[in-house]
């Protein structure tokens, strides 16, 4: 039912040239476009931070093992790198381990809340960079704004902020490259 309503709404908006009028307005009003974009990004940030603070989830499985390996590395315990150690088995985690190792000097060991809130910040900036990329490609401003609005509605990515994996950071660094 939701899909049918969404299709009907898009059909109505296209048929009545509402998208064209909105895009024309946004193209002529830079301040309005930036204000709407920033409000949408703030909504994504607030919803992500609220999710992180309300769930208070702790790392488990791989997330914990990488944080544990970073702590061990800072304390001279290299068992995670030895034969059958976690990092020796899962070398794909070395990038995340390096980031957690460096930042761990500042925020401490097993600081789940910091990493989760950092994920929220990276999600917000990823959506901003998506918007900037669409501007560089000279796509209509409505496309740039629609991407961020759909980001508000796409809960799985925001909910993913509680997982301390490299996916959020990877997409963030990939879009900023």
Protein language model regions, located:
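Start-transfer (signal-anchor) and selected internal transmembrane alpha helices
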Residues: 1-51
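Short helix- or helix-capping micro-motifs
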Residues: 44-45, 144-155
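Helix-to-loop transition at the C-terminal end of transmembrane segments
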Residues: 47-67
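Extracytosolic helix-loop segments that constitute the early lumenal/periplasmic catalytic or substrate-binding loops
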Residues: 64-88, 95
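Juxtamembrane segments of multi-pass membrane glycosylation machinery
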Residues: 75, 80, 95-118, 138-141, ...
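Alpha-helical transmembrane segments of multi-pass integral membrane proteins
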Residues: 88, 115-122, 166
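Transmembrane-helix motifs of polytopic, lipid-linked glycan transferases
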Residues: 117-138, 176
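Short acidic/glycine- and proline-prone juxtamembrane loop motifs at membrane-interface regions
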Residues: 156-169
């Amino acid at each position: 039912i939701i899909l049918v309503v969404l299709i009907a709404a898009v059909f109505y908006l296209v048929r009545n040239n509402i998208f064209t009028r909105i895009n024309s307005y946004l193209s002529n009003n830079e301040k309005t476009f930036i204000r709407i974009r920033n409000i949408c990004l703030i909504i994504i940030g607030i919803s992500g931070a609220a999710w992180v603070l309300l769930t208070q989830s702790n790392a488990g499985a791989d997330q914990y093992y990488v944080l544990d390996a970073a702590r061990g590395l800072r304390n001279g315990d290299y068992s995670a790198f030895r034969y059958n150690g976690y990092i020796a088995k899962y070398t794909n985690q070395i990038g995340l381990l390096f980031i957690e190792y460096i930042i761990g000097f500042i925020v401490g060991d097993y600081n789940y809340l910091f990493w989760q809130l950092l994920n929220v910040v990276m999600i917000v900036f990823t959506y901003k960079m998506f918007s900037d990329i669409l501007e560089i490609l000279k796509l209509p401003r409505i496309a740039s704004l629609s991407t961020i609005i759909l980001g508000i509605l796409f809960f799985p990515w925001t909910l993913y902020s509680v997982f301390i994996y490299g996916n959020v950071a990877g997409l963030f660094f990939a879009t900023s490259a």
